[in-house]
């Protein structure tokens, strides 16, 4: 499945957030600056909703079915138009795009990207196999089995494979938590842990990959000079003690030549490396199959590789041909070359012979007894050796004697001191390479599926091969041959090759080409990793390595990689380079596990991996295992690697990397104090870190009791976002006089918060007007980065029955304030019917009606609610609306793909709303609304007596300073005969008798009023949408719905309230949602 990014919709680019997340950033400031010709934003039909500029943009804005949302369709686009632009793939990381734009000046250059087409097998499984199987399997596994014994060798393999398996589980969780663009492992680590950790670990990963190239080259040289062409050696030992020096010098010279040639190949074109990758992989697979074939054959026909023993000591067979002290030539006993070596004379004299040679017999034993010979029992136990110690076979008769030191090269001796920890460090590189699949994330058709399946299958496959190989080697090969690292005792044959069928050359040639191929792959991957780090510009002095050839090949990074690899070549010992490699990879794997554990424990809203088989305890175990392996294998290397990583971390921190990648470490700042608050001041949170920080505006009754406690219940059920919760209320009056009431109200709210298990803060303000107090709360609540980004506002019940317009004016003014402050708004309607924390919905649906795109709040809120036990069993359904010209089938497919990448499980349904004529009911409903509004307006203008009476009522109630949240004086309406009949219909108008002499002229005009056409269209939208929603969602546990924006001028406020009432009529529980002008959910990891 392709990767998706959402492109900006009809608007200019506004910085990095648009580039990264792809969705248009709503700038209300710019909207405010676009004034209309009449100065009031009025439509030519005197509509308070639609301005002439928008009306001229085409039929989209005159769509009858969406007329209620038409004012903001330019910044909150229809879902149908948004889904049509989803499928726009890019395989560039954010840093790469920034770097590319910086180089091109205007930032307009874009490369055409091929559609990713690789599946799990070719894209992840086989590359991982090729990278995991390598030089250690062919050159060191037999030696490890002979030295550690089968049991301890199995333990080493188990520990190392468990480490990589746990890391792969963590990596799978991170990789499936959104689209991973090209950049693979480094991208995942850096975007999960932040620029400091990301840069440190990225460089460690780079150094590990670079030293891997050196290790593979050294392995190829060892195979070449030891088994393929020994005469090609340039340096030869000048004495008995110069053997190792000559070997190391040969490795350095040939290693440098090989490295130069491979660097040239990579420089000329990486396409040649990719072409030969399949050939190299075939070599690996054929070599492994030949080992198994040889093991099976050895059960009934073991190969002939005799080993010459002097007493119980193993002799180096490459220096003599006959395994005997004497031989018969022409019926005459003559000394063999072996006698000449130990006695320093061709004569059969014993004067100068080695004492051990004289006292012990020379015997010949089979090097490959076969699986049926029972050597497994002998090879179960360890036989660790010190450097220079002779390889001996337990059980053979031997007479101890002090041998001559100069004869030591005639024996097979240990070249290094061995122990369990040393073998762990040497073997661990043979299980690395698990990142090969994630490194190709940009080429995968469905990375979220392929990376976990392919990587874990590759680890399971290689682990089974390693386990079976350990048992096979222990069961088929003689112990002294296993401990013979270079095959000196079997005539300088590759030990694993002696077991292979049909010929040892299959393994020798196959391993040579596979190690060369692995070296080329490392030299190809490491420069690209360095280039990605350099393009992110988190380490300034590395920026030069972000540049390359015209086609993007990292020339300078390749040069630096070759220089660092040369340092590994100069070490010249495979056994010395392998632990260095282990340190850097273990460091990388440690931080992958740390990233997964941090994200899981923080439970950020964006942490929604499709891979479900992870747990923070597994990640923590993997992290602990990586740390333990680092110190077990080589504690001083571990300290050096950690010191390097620490220095890089502090350097990046000192330089002040101005990067915000939505990393998990920033999430920890929410639980810290001053230091965290200062860091949170640096800028707005990344979309991946966005969580609802709620400001809940409560209404108190006259006794200072919370009027709607279910608002707090609802806030507590959103606590899965792990965000901030502030509960606010307003006391009307003077602060000096009402301070005590404010304190009492605050205590009441805190008690209710405790009952409803809301963890947060309470703030009560005193203001002369309630709407001013609400504006103060919206502006000033919070501290630094700990500020609210969402407002929970109750619905103004009874607004129709109140003759005072302030009953709904305060509500609409608060909506406008949240919009101006770029805050999200949640309006739960019928809050009394919302469930308490003790209820459980065992079934049912949470329905989302996604009509216009508003930043993704509609998708995120149900996900957070379903984390709570009340809503956990509910299923999520997403409905969107298709018009006549929309392809509803394609919309459904696109929406399903989009939700797949958002990692949200939901049923998708596209509801077709065809353009229909405006019904008589809609016309009548609009007429009723406008008559009522006009009547109230005329009464307020002409009935001075009623105004005077209302003023008296207000004066009588001025002592009550506690005021409603949504109206300044909602309950001050006078009772009695003067009360106005608010429900005004044409029928009532016709049936009630009236006297024209007592009716103002303006009131006589009400019967002749014609409804405004824009209002008719909006009412049509509300009625049609309500019909569809009630039909589909009448049994839903909760309905989430886009909240239309308020009118631009205040004359349409009452009509706006009526539209909202009609839109939500007949629904038991409704949550009206209005985004804050920024994205809150993303497909990226």
Swiss-Prot record:
Chloride 1 binds at residues 433-435, 589. Pfam families: AA_permease, SLC12. GO terms for molecular function: ATP binding; metal ion binding; potassium:chloride symporter activity. Keywords: ATP-binding, Cell membrane, Chloride, Disulfide bond, Glycoprotein, Ion transport, Membrane, Metal-binding, Nucleotide-binding, Phosphoprotein, Potassium, Potassium transport, Symport, Transmembrane, Transmembrane helix, Transport. The modification Phosphothreonine is found at residue 983. ATP binds at residues 697, 699, 707-708, 730, 794-795, 797. Residues 142-149, 226-248, 298-419, 474-504 are extracellular. Residues 28-47 are annotated as: Disordered. Residues 665-681 are annotated as: Scissor helix. Glycans are attached at residues 245, 312, 331, 347. This is Solute carrier family 12 member 4. The gene is SLC12A4.
């Amino acid at each position: 499945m392709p990767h998706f990014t959402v492109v900006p919709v009809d608007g200019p680019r506004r910085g990095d957030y648009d580039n990264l997340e792809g969705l248009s950033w709503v700038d209300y400031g710019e909207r405010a600056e676009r004034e209309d010709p009449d100065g009031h934003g009025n439509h030519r039909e005197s509509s308070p909703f639609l301005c002439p500029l928008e009306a001229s943009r085409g039929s989209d804005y005159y769509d009858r079915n969406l007329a209620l949302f038409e004012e903001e369709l330019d910044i909150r686009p229809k879902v149908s138009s948004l889904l049509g632009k989803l499928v726009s793939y890019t395989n560039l990381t954010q840093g790469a795009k920034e770097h590319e734009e910086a180089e091109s000046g205007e930032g307009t250059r874009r490369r055409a990207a091929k559609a990713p087409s690789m599946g799990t097998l070719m894209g992840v499984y086989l590359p991982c196999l090729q990278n995991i199987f390598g030089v250690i399997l062919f050159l060191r596994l037999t030696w490890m089995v002979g030295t550690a014994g089968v049991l301890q060798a199995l333990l080493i393999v188990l520990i190392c494979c468990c480490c990589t398996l746990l890391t792969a589980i963590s990596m799978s969780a991170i990789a499936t938590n959104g689209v991973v663009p090209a950049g693979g492992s480094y991208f995942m680590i850096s975007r999960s842990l932040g620029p400091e950790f990301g840069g440190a670990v990225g460089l460690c990963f780079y150094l590990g990959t670079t030293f891997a190239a050196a290790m593979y080259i050294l392995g190829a040289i060892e195979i070449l000079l030891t088994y393929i062409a020994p005469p090609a050696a340039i340096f030869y030992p000048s004495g008995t003690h110069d053997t190792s020096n000559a070997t190391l010098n040969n490795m350095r010279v040939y290693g440098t030549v090989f490295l130069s040639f491979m660097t040239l190949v990579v420089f000329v074109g990486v396409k040649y490396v990719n072409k030969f990758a399949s050939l190299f992989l075939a070599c690996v697979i054929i070599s492994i199959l030949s080992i198994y074939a040889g093991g099976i054959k050895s059960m009934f026909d073991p190969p002939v590789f005799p080993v010459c023993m002097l007493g119980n000591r193993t002799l180096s067979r490459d220096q003599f041909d006959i395994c005997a002290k004497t031989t018969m030539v022409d019926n005459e006993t003559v000394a063999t070359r072996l006698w000449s070596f130990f006695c320093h004379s061709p004569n059969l004299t014993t004067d100068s012979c080695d004492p051990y040679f004289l006292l012990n017999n020379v015997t010949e034993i089979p090097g490959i007894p076969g699986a049926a010979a029972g050597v497994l029992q002998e090879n179960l136990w360890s036989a660790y050796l010190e450097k220079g110690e002779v390889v001996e076979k337990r059980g053979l008769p031997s007479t101890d004697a002090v041998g001559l030191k100069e004869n030591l090269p005639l024996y097979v001796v240990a070249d290094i001191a061995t122990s369990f920890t040393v073998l762990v460090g040497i073997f661990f590189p043979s299980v690395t390479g698990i990142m090969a699949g994630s490194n190709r994330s940009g080429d995968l058709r469905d990375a979220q599926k392929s990376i976990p399946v392919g990587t874990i299958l590759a680890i399971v496959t290689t682990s089974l091969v390693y386990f079976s190989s350990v048992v096979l080697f222990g069961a088929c090969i003689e112990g002294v041959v296993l401990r013979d690292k270079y095959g000196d005792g079997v005539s300088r044959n590759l030990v694993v090759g002696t077991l292979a069928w049909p010929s040892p050359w299959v393994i020798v040639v196959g391993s040579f080409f596979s190690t060369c191929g692995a070296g080329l792959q490392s030299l190809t991957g490491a420069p690209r990793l360095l280039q990605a780090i350099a393009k992110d510009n988190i380490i300034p002095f590395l920026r030069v390595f972000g540049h390359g050839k015209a086609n993007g090949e990292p020339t300078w990074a390749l040069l630096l990689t070759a220089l660092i690899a040369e340092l590994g070549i100069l070490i010249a010992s495979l056994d010395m380079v392998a632990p260095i490699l282990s340190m850097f990879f273990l460091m990388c794997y440690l931080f992958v596990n740390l990233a997964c554990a941090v994200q899981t424990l923080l439970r950020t809203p964006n942490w929604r991996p499709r891979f479900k088989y992870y747990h923070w305890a597994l990640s923590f175990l993997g992290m602990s295992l990586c740390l333990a392996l680092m110190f077990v294998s080589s504690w001083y290397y571990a300290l050096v690697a950690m010191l390097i990583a620490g220095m890089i971390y502090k350097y990046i921190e000192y330089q002040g990397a101005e990067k915000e990648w939505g990393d998990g470490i920033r999430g920890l700042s929410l639980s810290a104090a001053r230091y965290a608050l200062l860091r949170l001041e640096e800028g707005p949170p990344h979309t991946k870190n966005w969580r609802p920080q709620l400001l809940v505006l409560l209404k108190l009754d006259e006794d200072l009791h919370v009027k709607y406690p279910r608002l707090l219940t609802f806030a507590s059920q959103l606590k899965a976002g792990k965000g901030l919760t502030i509960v606010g209320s307003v006391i009307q009056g003077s602060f000096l006089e009402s301070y005590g009431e404010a304190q009492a109200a605050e205590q009441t709210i805190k008690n209710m918060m405790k009952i409803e298990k809301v963890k947060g803060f309470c703030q009560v303000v005193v203001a002369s007007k309630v709407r001013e107090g609400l504006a103060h709360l919206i502006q000033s609540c919070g501290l630094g980065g700990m500020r609210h980004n969402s407002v929970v506002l109750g619905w103004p019940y009874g607004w129709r029955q109140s003759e005072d317009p302030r009953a709904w004016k305060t509500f609409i003014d608060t909506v406008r304030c949240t919009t101006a402050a770029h805050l999200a708004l949640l309006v739960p309607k019928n809050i009394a019917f919302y469930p308490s924390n003790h209820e459980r919905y065992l079934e049912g649906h949470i329905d989302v009606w996604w009509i216009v795109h508003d930043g993704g709040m509609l998708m995120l809120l149900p996900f957070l609610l379903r984390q709570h036990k009340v809503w956990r069993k509910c299923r999520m359904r997403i409905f969107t609306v298709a018009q006549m010209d929309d392809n509803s089938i394609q919309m459904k497919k696109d929406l399903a793909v989009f939700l797949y990448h958002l990692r949200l499980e939901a049923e998708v349904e596209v509801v077709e709303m065809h353009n229909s004529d405006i019904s008589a009911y809609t016309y009548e409903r609009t007429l009723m609304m406008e008559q009522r509004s006009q009547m109230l307006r005329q009464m307020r203008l002409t009935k001075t007596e009623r105004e005077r009476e209302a003023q008296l009522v207000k004066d009588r109630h001025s002592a009550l300073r506690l005021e409603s949240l949504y109206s300044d004086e909602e309950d001050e309406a006078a009772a009695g005969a003067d009360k106005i009949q608010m429900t005004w219909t044409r029928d009532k108008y016709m049936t009630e008798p009236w006297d024209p002499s007592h009716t103002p002229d303006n009131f006589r005009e009400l019967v002749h009023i014609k409804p405004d056409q824009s209002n008719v269209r909006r009412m049509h939208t509300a009625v049609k949408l309500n019909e569809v929603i009630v039909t589909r969602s009448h049994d839903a546990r909760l309905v989430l719905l886009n909240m239309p924006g308020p009118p631009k001028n205040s004359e349409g406020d009452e009509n706006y309230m009526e539209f909202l009432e009609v839109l939500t009529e007949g629904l038991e529980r409704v949550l009206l949602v209005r985004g804050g002008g920024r994205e809150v959910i993303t497909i990226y990891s």
